[in-house]
């Protein structure tokens, strides 16, 4: 087995990850059904419930602030034994005054799941928390509430990157988070393959993630670390945007050099095709759109047979870690793969349609097509080492395509009206990609300039120089007149 442990850091990360886990649960097959092409052991762990029954729960650790879990409890029906509702007073003989916060009422969707009834159609109005559309049970160890900060607090907002750093340091000093939260899951693995991290990157969760991943690298140095770094795409005032951009710059600087994959994700992107309906005010909607691309492009990591996803990410030189996430929804019968390297997609989650001042160069592209006719990939007839040297000599990009006939399922936990023009309402075909290109250098240059103007004196030089060093790897090693641009 090649297991993956997931970390979910913060509210936006949990909105996206909940869609991800609902999709994984939908791939299970039962009884006489044909075996699923998805290997569930990659992301799920066997266990035993409170009543002795066998369980199968996600191998994940979910962090959120106080009030962020909604109706999700640490102990659910799988792990909860009936407790005495009127416990004794113990040694205290005085009068007790018990103060409890009013419980959040369960959503109709969750009530229907518990009762085994058909689920009602969800809407932006009925989804209040990410737990409102969650379809899975989690192990109690997976639920970690951080009580130091409260969700959406105006008094102590969890927004500044350094606050996240400080919170991690305090908690890690007191509890050793890696030992308490990650190690129990890691020790259950036969062959731990990677750690997958969903995190916000333009708020305090970026600082929290940076410190966490630094610890992960110390402990699991040879394992892959895949980071889905979520940025708030909603319009805000100029001052707030400066703060967010500085947080992004800090996250790229601190995390991308430690990660095997660092994919900045704008949630939501501003450029939405007319064929897609999106309620940009709803995180349930926007994270659903992201999940269609993110879950599709990472699908090879859990398909049978084993795919060497890491080698495809590494490219020819292993120096590029910042990837662009892109996708296109494809109608039945469409040929989505006329040419191997694609530079234009319907949805660009990383640079939101940013065009370089000059034509941009693609260093590496990994495509995943699902539900489509297999257009084939790079020829396997020639030795891969020779192909790699040829590409390097000719400044050509590395290209890899994975294909599966498994379409993207439209679950009842997913917005039902997001793809109104597609023929099928139950499944869609998707072409998704992770791309390394010189557009990253353009964005890093913007961050360098911002850091030079806005960052504090104590971090300015380190941040500007560090971003400059990363930027150079996306500018060198290719010829500007390469054929692989967006002509």
Curated annotation (Swiss-Prot):
Short name of any one Pfam family annotated for the protein: Tubulin_3
GO biological process terms held by the UniProt record: mitochondrion organization
Any one Gene Ontology cellular component term annotated for this protein: mitochondrion
Keywords for the protein's UniProt record, in alphabetical order: Mitochondrion
Annotated Gene3D superfamilies: Tubulin/FtsZ, GTPase domain
Compartments where located: Mitochondrion
InterPro entries assigned: DML1/Misato (IPR049942), DML1/Misato_tubulin (IPR029209), Misato_II_tubulin-like (IPR019605), Tubulin/FtsZ_GTPase_sf (IPR036525)
UniProt cross-references to SUPFAM superfamilies, sorted A to Z: Tubulin nucleotide-binding domain-like
Family: Belongs to the misato family.
Known role: Involved in the partitioning of the mitochondrial organelle and mitochondrial DNA (mtDNA) inheritance.
Name of the protein: Protein dml1
Species of the source: Aspergillus niger (strain ATCC MYA-4892 / CBS 513.88 / FGSC A1513)
